Amino acid sequence: MFGLGRPQPTSAEKIAAVENELKVVAEMHSRMVKICTLKCIDKTYREGDLSKGESVCLDRCASKFFETHQKISDQLQKETQARGGGGFGM
Amino acid sequence: MDGLTAAESRELDQRLQKRQVKEFMSVFGNLVDNCFTACVDDFTSKALSGRESGCISRCVLKSMSTQTRLGERFGELNAAMTAEMQRR
């Protein structure tokens, strides 16, 4: 206001920032559920309970999904830096 | 949370509640689509057969267990990832 410090984010900006962060996490969660269901769950539905094999598959799928997320994120960051911050046309 | 004032926090809560309703509708919609696709394949009758109906019930039960289990794993893994990112 009086030229002191950097401009403060408005209320709307602060709320949008938190909301956006939660949205990213929620989207990742729903993608993981969709993908791991496809990979692990037997589609004949002869049983209403998760089998031992399906449960183990879901746990491993979740773990690998996160590891893949991290791996690709690291790799993209590295590639982008190597190209002087202009990688992938972004 | 993230240095929000009480009023901002209330506003955020209201928005998140709206999102939750939307998210529930989308989970419900996906459940119908998945279980219909997996279980309903006989169109010689307009009513669900006993077999289809049983399949749908089991599909719903299994999908709910899947949601719960993956929800737990997601929480753990997300917490670990957040901690790792803050450590770096």
Curated annotation (Swiss-Prot), chain B:
Top-level taxon: Eukaryota
Gene Ontology CC, one term: mitochondrial inner membrane
InterPro entries: Mito_inner_translocase_sub, Tim10-like, Tim10-like_dom_sf
A single BP term in Gene Ontology: protein transport
Disulfide bonds: 35-59, 39-55
Membrane topology of this protein: Peripheral membrane protein
UniProt short sequence motif Twin CX3C motif, positions renumbered to this chain: 35-59
A Pfam family recorded for this sequence: zf-Tim10_DDP
GO function term, MF aspect, one: metal ion binding
Keyword terms of this UniProt record: Chaperone, Disulfide bond, Membrane, Metal-binding, Mitochondrion, Mitochondrion inner membrane, Protein transport, Translocation, Transport, Zinc
Record's subcellular location: Mitochondrion inner membrane
Quaternary data: Heterohexamer; composed of 3 copies of tim9 and 3 copies of tim10, named soluble 70 kDa complex. Associates with the tim22 complex, whose core is composed of tim22 and tim54. Interacts with the transmembrane regions of multi-pass transmembrane proteins in transit.
Domain notes: The twin CX3C motif contains 4 conserved Cys residues that form 2 disulfide bonds in the mitochondrial intermembrane space. However, during the transit of tim9 from cytoplasm into mitochondrion, the Cys residues probably coordinate zinc, thereby preventing folding and allowing its transfer across mitochondrial outer membrane.
PANTHER family hit by this protein: MITOCHONDRIAL IMPORT INNER MEMBRANE TRANSLOCASE SUBUNIT TIM9B
Family membership noted in the UniProt record: Belongs to the small Tim family.
Role summary: Mitochondrial intermembrane chaperone that participates in the import and insertion of multi-pass transmembrane proteins into the mitochondrial inner membrane. Also required for the transfer of beta-barrel precursors from the TOM complex to the sorting and assembly machinery (SAM complex) of the outer membrane. Acts as a chaperone-like protein that protects the hydrophobic precursors from aggregation and guide them through the mitochondrial intermembrane space.
Protein name: Mitochondrial import inner membrane translocase subunit tim9
Organism: Neurospora crassa (strain ATCC 24698 / 74-OR23-1A / CBS 708.71 / DSM 1257 / FGSC 987)
Organism lineage string: Eukaryota, Fungi, Dikarya, Ascomycota, Pezizomycotina
This protein's encoding gene: tim9
